[in-house]
Amino acid sequence: MSAAMRAPGARGLAPSPAALGARRGSARAPFHAARIARRRPSLARRAARAAVESHETDVVVIGAGIGGLCAGALSAKYGKRVTVVESHDVAGGAAHSWKRDGYTFESGPSLYSGMSQWPTTNPCGQVLHALDEPLPCVYYNTWMCHLPEGSFLTEVGNDQFVDVLKRFVPDVDGVNAAQEWLRLKTLMKPLAAASSALPPSAVRTDAFAAVTLARFVPGLLAAAPVLPEIMAPYSKFLEKNEIKHPFIKNWMEVLCFLLSGAPASGTLAAEIGYMFDDWYRPNSTLEFPVGGSEAIVEALARGLRKNGGRLELRSHVESVDVDGASGRATGVTLRNGSKIVAKEAVISNATVWDTLKILPPNAMESVKGGDDWVKEVNETKTCASFMHLHLGIDAAGLPDDLEIHHIYVADWDRGVTAEQNMVLVSIASVLDPSLAPEGKHVIHAYTPGNEPLELWQGLERGTPEYERLKEERSAVLWRAVEKAIPDVRDRVEKSFVGSPLTQQRWQRRHKGTYGGTGWITEDSDTIPITSATTPMDGLFVVGDSNFPGPGVPSVAAHGWSAAHELAPFWKQCQMLDKVAP
């Protein structure tokens, strides 16, 4: 799941909320947009029917997830010849969608901000800005919570949450939840400002970093007093500032988990500061791309192609080619035997574990620092996975003000990371009717990275044992959807359940994992950096298995990192004039 946050001011190229439908808020105005015309197959889905032939390029990117597309499109924008090869028949990776009988089912992110209005500090929004690819969005500011305290509507961008706290959350040991929340908001202001002081688009690892970072020095100096806090786990911030009310602490645990796939003890305070600022500044909004997550993928694919890049689907990489004498990555070999020679770089958007599998035996260990990198990869913890429930339902008689997002937590005492304890529900057709047939809704419910991988190891898809476990483990998803639509089972016309094995097979992900985790702990004495580099010359890795882990902003930041390892610093400076003025 992605909390892709940022919705700054009025200046930007995106259509206004009025052009796309009324903003959803306290007035509870439903989205009355005309049904979007059915389009021809998207750029993200159209693939060459002929097998990819051997050729030479500057950069080859393995995998067309958002991280890979960002890296490839930016590299093409900087003038590189780029070929992106994707094993699947559709681009997008964890953000891909699929269609059945007029429904568009989404497999991944559903919660966005900072994608459409420019300038923005969202790394993915900055990529779209760099590519001159506007992203039409529907704007809204409400979502529904089904928590142990009760079910209630909450808003971003104002103090409505204070009213919710006063109504639903009692005092505990003399601590008032509403007052504690207002105190926390004040404490978070310097944290939020510091978190936005240095955009990933400014970073590079060579000596010219002094040039690209120079314009951000004043902001970094202003943030200096809180830098130790933003580079520590957020749990330490809560402890230091004596945030004691159980509900406020639990709510921040939810936000941390939505953002990073980890609890507060495993989430950098910088990450939560960035998101907190985005959600709770006055008049903030969330965004839903018209066309769903696929619209982001299409925009990145357009940006790649219009700058001369190639996107080759159904093109499975069998191995990374490495020069035996120099130890440099020189290209890839596809399953059909074709070879793509990369004069400058191979960028892998496969997970680090899967990337290691397609390197020649001992190739990484043979280069300086390679042993340590292999050890680090093998020791990187895997996030848990997902259970997915995809539904197409009859919407007759459902209220016009049905919310797009619902969050369900069963038991605070178990913790938000506990298996089967937290579910997210997205009803995307509430805001974009084109995603379902007339009079229908499409629903995606999922456990956000809390499904244990080990439960599924050794099972074979399609067996009775597998089907029984799918039914058992998807029951909580049905319960969560029933919180939003009590009679949903009577309305179902299409129903599909996905498991970690689904993710492992269709997304070719190591064990079906959601990504990497475990870099941040309360006893850490060092903090990793966001970097696409590896010890092997010419090989870069991007995606959610690298620090800081899952999320659209995180993987887009890797795209910037990889592109700027290859681009001249003066072109990067020109780009910063545009995306981070």
In which residue ranges do the predicted regions lie?
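A glycine-rich dinucleotide-binding beta-alpha-beta segment and adjacent secondary-structure elements
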Residues: I248-P263, L424, K483-P548
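C-terminal segments that line or cap access tunnels to active or ligand-binding sites in enzymes
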Residues: D394-L501
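Helical element adjacent to the flavin cofactor pocket in flavoenzyme catalytic cores
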Residues: Y274-S338
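N-terminal chloroplast transit peptides
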Residues: M1-A37
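Rossmann-like flavin
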Residues: E149-F152, G157-T267
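Mid-domain catalytic core of redox enzymes
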Residues: F288-P289, H316-P437
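N-terminal glycine-rich phosphate/pyrophosphate-binding loop and immediately adjacent elements
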Residues: S54-P200, T517-G518
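A conserved FAD-binding loop/helix module that cradles the flavin
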Residues: P109, D544-A567
